[in-house]
């Protein structure tokens, strides 16, 4: 069997009809370049999942991973460790005013789940607002928060999520023809949504400041 055949036979790919996929078989990557198993070099315009923004195999990142792996590879959350609090301090230095602590998770979707739980716990309110054409993850609550069609198969409509239209002048939901019109109408829409849903029922609004998977 070829590498591609073995990949398709053993790996379940997310967001894909398994019988129709034909993934590129990557051998290595460096900087902005990805090299396939057949030697083809491709310029990685998508930065993988829009996350390798300093390039592949950055020497400083590789060195730090190697150094840490030689000392400690995992630690239970009930323990303290220097690398973790140093990372937290760096994040807090660059975060918003008033940020006091960092809660580490395994990824973005888990971060969203915890953020929603915290918002509901501290407000006592059930609803969270999110925009259409958004992506917030693929676990229970985060996939309901996601605002594109990929959520449909798993959207139970019972997660206390309310969607609204965000600004999108290219295909405006508000029939706007200028940026000023789009901004004004896009701000009025969630305001009306909040009023009709009941302000006292809303725990949080989740937004992508820069649309990623469902926008770029």
Kindly label every feature range from the protein language model:
Residues 36-37:
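Short, acidic, Ser/Thr-enriched surface-loop or helix-capping motifs
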Residues 1-32:
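Active-site-adjacent loop/helix segments that line or gate small-molecule/cofactor pockets in enzymes
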Residues 25-28, 95, 147:
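Short solvent-exposed loop/turn micro-motifs enriched in small/polar/acidic residues
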Residues 13-17, 45-59, 145, 213-214:
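Glycine-rich phosphate/pyrophosphate-binding beta-alpha loops
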Residues 40-41, 216:
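Residue-level signal for well-ordered, solvent-exposed loop/turn and beta-edge residues enriched
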Residues 94, 211-216:
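Conserved beta-strand/loop elements of the cytosolic catalytic core of P-type E1-E2 ATPases, chiefly
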Residues 135-210:
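PLP-dependent aminotransferase-class I/II
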Residues 41-129, 137:
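Glycine-rich loop-to-alpha-helix module at the N-terminal edge of alpha/beta enzyme cores
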């Amino acid at each position: 069997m070829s590498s591609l055949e073995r990949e398709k036979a053993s790996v379940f790919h997310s967001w894909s009809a398994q019988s129709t996929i034909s993934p590129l078989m990557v051998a290595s990557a460096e900087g902005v370049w990805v090299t396939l198993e057949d030697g083809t070099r491709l310029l990685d315009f998508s930065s993988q999942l829009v996350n390798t923004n300093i390039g592949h195999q950055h020497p400083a990142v590789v060195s730090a991973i190697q150094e840490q792996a030689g000392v400690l590879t995992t630690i239970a959350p009930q323990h303290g460790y220097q690398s973790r609090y140093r990372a937290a301090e760096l994040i807090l230095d660059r975060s918003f005013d008033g940020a006091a602590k960092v809660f580490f998770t395994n990824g973005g979707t888990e971060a969203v789940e915890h953020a929603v739980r915290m918002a509901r716990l501290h407000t006592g309110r059930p609803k969270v607002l999110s925009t259409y054409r958004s992506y917030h993850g693929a676990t229970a609550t985060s996939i309901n928060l996601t605002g594109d069609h990929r959520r449909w198969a798993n959207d139970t409509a019972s997660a206390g999520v309310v969607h609204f239209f965000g600004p999108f002048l290219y295909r405006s939901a508000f029939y706007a023809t200028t940026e000023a019109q789009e901004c004004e109408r896009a701000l009025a829409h969630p305001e009306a949504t909040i009023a009709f849903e009941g302000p006292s029922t809303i725990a949080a609004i989740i937004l992508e400041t820069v649309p990623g998977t469902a926008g770029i």
